[in-house]
Regions:
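Ribosome-associated RNA-binding proteins
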Residues: 1-136
């Protein structure tokens, strides 16, 4: 292949077109682990509109798992969802992390109307053996 020739990729970052949704209803998926919290805003059909996490708010390291980082991520995701045209949201919470309550409270403080909160954490009926306990 001759030098200097591109391989079909654009030279710079391309500007992404903002999505507008026709339906004003959406779902806020709050996935909270001990290390991080991810908030994904989707349409009621499941198409992703936007997402935010503890890391996208500018927090690094172990502080990504804190309640503060998850509340910042929830506000960030809610603002982007409102720009896309979402007005009502149902919150689905998953995981054992510390940021789940803070994320729900932060979503309630925004201008989004909360239609319901559902806990969809998966609980094993004695499935796989958990990892051994940490000794400090």
């Amino acid at each position: 292949m001759p030098k200097g020739k591109g391989r079909g990729r654009p030279a710079g970052r391309t500007k992404k077109k903002k999505k507008r949704v026709s339906d004003a209803n959406g779902i806020a998926h709050v996935k909270s682990s001990f290390n991080n919290t991810t908030i994904t805003m989707t349409t009621s059909g499941g198409d992703v509109i936007t997402w935010a996490s503890g890391g996208t708010t500018g927090v690094k390291g172990t502080r990504k798992g804190t309640a503060f980082a998850s509340s910042q991520a929830a506000v960030q995701a809610a603002e982007k969802a409102m720009e896309a045209g979402i007005k009502k949201v149902e919150i689905w919470v998953r995981g054992p992390g510390s940021g789940r309550e803070a994320a729900v409270r932060a979503l309630q403080s925004t201008n989004l109307e909360i239609t319901g909160i559902k806990d969809i954490t998966k609980v094993p009926h004695n499935g796989c053996r958990p990892p051994k306990r940490r000794r400090m």
